[in-house]
């Protein structure tokens, strides 16, 4: 027995020692983590890669190779799995050498510096340093070998003479990584660094794998993705005037895209603007909303707002003018620009907007209906096997029980609307209080104060705002192109299929008051009456239908509101194709045609672009080069002067749009473009006025679900409701006991009265 007692005592002692050691290790780890994120640390672009100043390895660059994945290390012991798209892994063979250092520090990187020419090895003074409010940033200079202003455009000979230099800073973190506790929460400002080597693109935010991979330009995705890139003509001090700033927000329906798909070297260097491109959270990670305090949503648009704040506070160090920031981008990027233009937290920072094929007033730009957002979140959670009994359980399952790859790669077809994810109107949502989380305050959560249309009508934007917008003639061709069913049928649409697609549209948008009337109205508007059975015209009309509904009509609506309030507004319609692509006739001018022209692709080395966009120099035509020069000059002029053509560009000029006479530049080529008025007014009015007011408003319906979610969220709430329940039970028990006691007392009194009234009976019982 004594030996057994000694063994038990020894075991207890060992357990105590183990617990003590564990506590010491945890304390030390916490202390190291706290030190590692101090403002005096050296920061290396990825979550967990911090080296404190006082350790021996401070000067050693610790790098996780983003280009080829990475393995666990002592700084980040968790293996996160491959981040490349599976279909592109064959591009990375085991014999491929790993770069010992990131970006250009490990050797010449053609995707960052262009083609390596004989004189590239003698390139001196490559590195450039800039001091920001967050610490010092190291970038690099890139040599450019073609000149958009040159009269002679060499299209079939090698270009070997350096014509310009541009200063490039890639992968600058504008917020703390939105990982772990930061998932489904607003972004937090970065805490700074001592020296940041901004020499490689940051990873893209998680998105479906069909959009990722080396051939598509998105080599790596990671939840730690809140980075921005800066291109500037010069960082030298003493400039008489700062450059205008062009803030690029990528499109992609709020579900895919990346900042590195817009290399802005030519635009910045030759047109004297500072260009900034950003990543922001996408899909469910960026826009999941339960309509309450568990996940209000809008994290992606809040990321954009924080990036804009970072630029506003720091861009002067890169010779950018913070009071001349122009937001631009295609599709979702254009819609985001319009929302930031009127949002309370950002409107004072936005001086101009260029909306390419997108509008803040589009149906897909903002989810107005709270229950639509909740329904999308429930359907998404169910698809990943999460409980939807309450919003708290739903969010906890997605936050703690699913990886970012699972969340990013899960695609969803919405019950209502075009795209599943978008900013949601949140001004009446309940949000977490200041005491709920250490790093977040109530002011961090709300983005909207009212509907965007109401903000525009109330003139809640900068007084010096200028607006420019454009659409293409075949905006929705990409929807047809990406439809797998239509692809199997060689994109042929006959009258029966047209009717089917129109009915799908009617049902998807739940025109429940008169669905048959809506169907007939749409069919009448978009039937090609000279030859109703012609499948070519039917396909063209269907593309026009979707283009007008999703892009043209919303663009027309916001333009009219701004023109009525005397905001300088310039419009264009793009009606010419990129000749080098040789696209089929029905999709010559699709959505975001301007991308390759705005990036100066006809003048850039092909190495800057992913395989998807690589076009040899001899494929570009003179018209492509002219259009590229025109768009870069017009956009940069607008950012600088508020007018895209203060003087003619290749013989072309814009006119201001006016009330009752919406003038727009109809861009065919630089030889036969012209100013016209009132683009597709009948079709725009059909979608904006006729359907909503005459046939019936949008009345969305959803699968039956519990209307209200409830679940304890915080310890104080759990304690409160537990005590409340206990008190209620005690109260009920007390009432029951009182009633029983009173009943018993009543019976006792009645018995005494009976005995008092019958003394003979009482005496008999006694005897």
Protein language model regions, located:
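Non-catalytic accessory segments of hydrolases
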Residues: 35-299, 322, 609-631, 639-649, ...
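Cleavable N-terminal signal peptides of Sec/SRP-targeted secreted and luminal proteins
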Residues: 13-33, 171
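Substrate-gating cap/lid region and adjacent catalytic-acid/histidine neighborhood
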Residues: 365, 404-622, 719-735
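N-terminal secretory signal peptides that target proteins for export/translocation
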Residues: 1-13
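Cytosolic C-terminal tails of single-pass type I membrane
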Residues: 747-767
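Transmembrane-helix exit/juxtamembrane "anchor" motif
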Residues: 643-645, 733-749
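Serine-hydrolase-like catalytic core of hydrolytic proteins
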Residues: 65, 215-391, 456-480, 567, ...
């Amino acid at each position: 027995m004594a030996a057994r007692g000694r063994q038990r005592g020894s075991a207890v002692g060992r357990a105590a020692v183990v617990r003590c050691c564990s506590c010491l290790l945890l304390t030390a780890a916490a202390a190291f983590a706290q030190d590692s994120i101090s403002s005096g640390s050296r920061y290396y672009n990825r979550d967990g890669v911090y080296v404190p100043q006082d350790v021996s390895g401070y000067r050693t660059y610790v790098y996780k190779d983003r280009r080829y994945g990475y393995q666990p290390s002592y700084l980040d012991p968790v293996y996160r799995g491959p981040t490349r798209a599976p279909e592109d892994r064959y591009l990375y063979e085991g014999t491929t050498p790993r770069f010992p250092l990131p970006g250009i520090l490990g050797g010449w990187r053609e995707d960052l510096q262009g083609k390596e020419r004989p004189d590239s090895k003698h390139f001196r003074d490559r590195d450039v340093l800039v001091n920001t409010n967050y610490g010092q940033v190291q970038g690099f200079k890139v040599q450019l070998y073609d000149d958009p202003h040159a009269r002679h455009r060499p299209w079939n000979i090698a270009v070997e003479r350096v014509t310009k230099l541009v200063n490039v800073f890639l992968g600058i973190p504008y917020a703390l990584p939105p990982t772990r506790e930061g998932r489904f929460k607003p972004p937090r400002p970065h805490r700074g660094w001592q020296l940041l080597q901004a020499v490689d693109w940051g990873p893209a935010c998680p998105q479906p794998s069909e959009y990722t991979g080396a051939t598509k330009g998105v080599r790596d995705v990671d939840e730690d993705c809140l980075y921005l890139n800066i291109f500037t003509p010069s960082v030298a001090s003493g400039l008489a005037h700062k450059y205008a700033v062009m803030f690029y927000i990528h499109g992609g329906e709020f579900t895919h895209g990346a900042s590195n798909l817009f290399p802005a070297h030519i635009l910045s260097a030759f047109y004297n603007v500072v260009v900034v491109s950003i990543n922001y959270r996408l899909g469910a990670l960026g826009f999941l909303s339960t309509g309450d305090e568990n996940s209000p949503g809008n994290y992606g648009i809040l990321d954009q707002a924080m990036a804009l704040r970072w630029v506003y506070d720091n861009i002067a160090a890169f010779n950018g003018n913070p009071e001349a920031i122009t937001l631009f981008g295609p599709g979702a990027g254009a819609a985001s620009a319009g929302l930031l233009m009127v949002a309370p937290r950002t409107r004072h920072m936005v001086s101009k907007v260029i909306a390419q094929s997108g509008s803040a007033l589009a149906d897909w730009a903002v989810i107005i209906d709270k229950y639509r957002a909740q329904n999308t979140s429930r359907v998404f959670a169910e698809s990943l096997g999460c409980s939807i009994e309450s919003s708290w359980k739903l969010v906890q399952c997605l936050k703690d029980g699913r990886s970012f790859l699972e969340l990013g790669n899960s695609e969803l077809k919405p019950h209502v609307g075009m795209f599943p994810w978008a900013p949601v109107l949140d001004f009446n949502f309940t949000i977490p209080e200041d005491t709920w989380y250490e790093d977040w305050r109530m002011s961090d959560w709300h983005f909207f104060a009212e509907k965007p249309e109401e903000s525009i009508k109330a003139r809640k934007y900068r007084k010096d705002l200028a607006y420019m917008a454009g659409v293409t003639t075949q905006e929705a061709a990409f929807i047809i192109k990406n439809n797998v069913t239509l692809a199997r049928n060689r994109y042929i649409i006959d009258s029966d299929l047209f009717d089917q697609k129109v009915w799908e549209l009617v049902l998807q948008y739940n025109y429940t008051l008169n669905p048959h009337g809506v169907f007939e109205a749409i069919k009448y508007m978009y039937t090609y009456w000279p030859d109703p059975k012609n499948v070519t015209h039917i396909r063209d009309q269907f593309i026009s239908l979707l283009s007008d509904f999703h892009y043209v009509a919303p663009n027309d609506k916001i333009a009219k509101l701004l023109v009525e309030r005397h905001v300088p507004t310039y419009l264009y319609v793009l009606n010419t194709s990129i000749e080098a692509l040789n696209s089929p006739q029905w999709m010559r001018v699709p959505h975001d045609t301007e991308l390759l022209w705005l990036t100066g692709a006809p003048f850039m080395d092909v190495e800057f672009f992913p395989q998807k966009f690589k076009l040899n120099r001899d494929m570009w035509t003179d018209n492509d080069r002219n259009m590229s020069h025109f768009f870069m000059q017009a956009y940069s002029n607008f950012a600088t002067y508020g007018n895209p053509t203060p003087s003619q560009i290749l013989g072309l000029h814009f006119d201001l749009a006016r009330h009752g006479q919406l003038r727009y530049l109809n861009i065919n080529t630089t030889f036969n473009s012209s100013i016209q008025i009132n683009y597709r007014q009948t079709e725009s009015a059909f979608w904006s006025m006729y359907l909503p007011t005459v046939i019936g408003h949008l009345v969305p319906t959803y699968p039956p679900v519990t209307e209200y979610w409830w679940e304890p969220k915080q310890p104080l709430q759990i304690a409160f409701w537990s005590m409340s329940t206990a008190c209620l039970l005690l109260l009920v028990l007390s009432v029951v006991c009182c009633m029983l006691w009173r009943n018993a007392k009543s019976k006792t009194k009645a018995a005494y009265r009976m005995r008092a009234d019958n003394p003979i009976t009482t005496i008999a019982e006694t005897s």
